[in-house]
């Protein structure tokens, strides 16, 4: 596989882009783990984001045929895959811009997104997944992002983004991936995750509220919110929900934070 990749680089004068997070998967065990994870959830449709040189795509197209599609932004990679492997089951497009729902005529009951997400846009792609009509996702992300998505309350990685994702999604780790599984090797390890939507509508107001409440981790909720809400009402809401007046955002679960958001929204 390494020889094939190097041959592609040479023949196409291709240099992997750090900005686009172009690290190509070469570990067959990891490829098998991804494909097995996708197959296990019995997807009605499979959308692969950034298939690269097709390490995962090759197996997915065999298993899911017309129920599979890929999106690739890089023109050289797109043409390579379209000509040699995916044959009109790939779009040359920006995954952040295109409407994922429009790719298939009918998404069915369990549409699933798959991808090795570039670090610099992984949070945007995850939010787009939350807002989309897709139900599940099998994603590879840098370990740092994985820690944020899996973070427990009171941990250093627990953030507004953690709370937002965990309120909307069930997040579980499948496996950690060494740097050596990719070419070129990234500087950090990656994590393979399974995301599944909860039956909860996305709330834009709650997203804004989380950004405010996590503004400064050292400050209490009261101090972070007092410029946007009446301090008396903040205390009233905290006490009515059984929280301490000196509570900090990282001490509360995503559900508790949403309860506080709802309480303040009704009072203010």
Curated annotation (Swiss-Prot):
GO MF annotations, alphabetized: 16S rRNA (adenine(1518)-N(6)/adenine(1519)-N(6))-dimethyltransferase activity; RNA binding
Residues that hold S-adenosyl-L-methionine according to the record: 23, 25, 50, 72, 94, 116
Record key words, sorted: Cytoplasm, Methyltransferase, RNA-binding, rRNA processing, S-adenosyl-L-methionine, Transferase
Entry keyword rRNA processing: yes
Localization: Cytoplasm
Enzyme Commission number(s) of this protein: 2.1.1.182
GO cellular component, one term: cytosol
Tree of life domain: Bacteria
Catalytic activity: adenosine(1518)/adenosine(1519) in 16S rRNA + 4 S-adenosyl-L-methionine = N(6)-dimethyladenosine(1518)/N(6)-dimethyladenosine(1519) in 16S rRNA + 4 S-adenosyl-L-homocysteine + 4 H(+)
Major site of localization recorded for this protein: cytoplasm
Major enzyme class: transferase
Secretion signal span: none
PROSITE patterns per UniProt: RRNA_A_DIMETH, SAM_RNA_A_N6_MT
UniProt keyword annotation of Transmembrane helix present: no
InterPro entries given in the database record: KsgA/Erm (IPR001737), rRNA_Ade_diMease-like_C (IPR023165), rRNA_Ade_Mease_Trfase_CS (IPR020596), rRNA_Ade_methylase_Trfase_N (IPR020598), rRNA_adenine_dimethylase (IPR011530), SAM-dependent_MTases_sf (IPR029063)
Pfam family membership, one: RrnaAD
Function noted in UniProt: Specifically dimethylates two adjacent adenosines (A1518 and A1519) in the loop of a conserved hairpin near the 3'-end of 16S rRNA in the 30S particle. May play a critical role in biogenesis of 30S subunits.
Family in the record: Belongs to the class I-like SAM-binding methyltransferase superfamily. rRNA adenine N(6)-methyltransferase family. RsmA subfamily.
HAMAP family: 16SrRNA_methyltr_A
Protein name: Ribosomal RNA small subunit methyltransferase A
UniProt organism field: Mycoplasmoides gallisepticum (strain R(low / passage 15 / clone 2))
């Amino acid at each position: 596989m390494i020889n094939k990749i190097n041959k592609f680089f040479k023949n196409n004068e291709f240099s992997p882009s750090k900005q686009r997070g172009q690290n190509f998967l070469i570990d067959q065990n990891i490829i098998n783990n991804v494909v097995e994870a996708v197959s296990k959830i019995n997807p009605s449709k499979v959308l692969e984001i950034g298939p690269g040189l097709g390490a995962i795509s090759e197996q997915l197209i065999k298993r899911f045929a017309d129920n599979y599609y890929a999106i690739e932004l890089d023109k050289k990679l797109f043409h390579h895959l379209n000509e040699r492997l995916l044959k009109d089951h790939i779009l040359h497009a920006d995954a952040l811009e295109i409407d994922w729902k429009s790719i298939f005529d009918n998404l069915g009951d369990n549409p699933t997104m798959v991808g090795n997400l570039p670090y610099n846009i992984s949070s945007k792609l995850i939010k787009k997944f939350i807002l989309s009509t897709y139900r599940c996702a099998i994603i590879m992300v840098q370990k740092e992002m994985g820690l944020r998505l899996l973070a427990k309350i009171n941990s250093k990685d627990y953030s507004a983004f953690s709370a937002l994702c965990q309120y909307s999604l069930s997040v579980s780790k499948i496996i950690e991936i060494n740097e050596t599984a990719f070419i070129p090797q990234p500087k950090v390890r990656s994590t393979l995750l399974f995301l599944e939507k909860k039956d909860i509508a996305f709330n834009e107001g709650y997203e804004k509220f989380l950004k405010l409440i996590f503004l400064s981790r050292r400050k209490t909720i009261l101090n972070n919110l007092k410029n946007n809400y009446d301090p008396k009402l903040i205390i009233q809401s905290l006490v009515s929900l059984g929280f301490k007046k000196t509570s900090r955002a990282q001490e509360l679960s995503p559900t508790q934070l949403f309860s506080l958001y709802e309480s303040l929204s009704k009072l203010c």
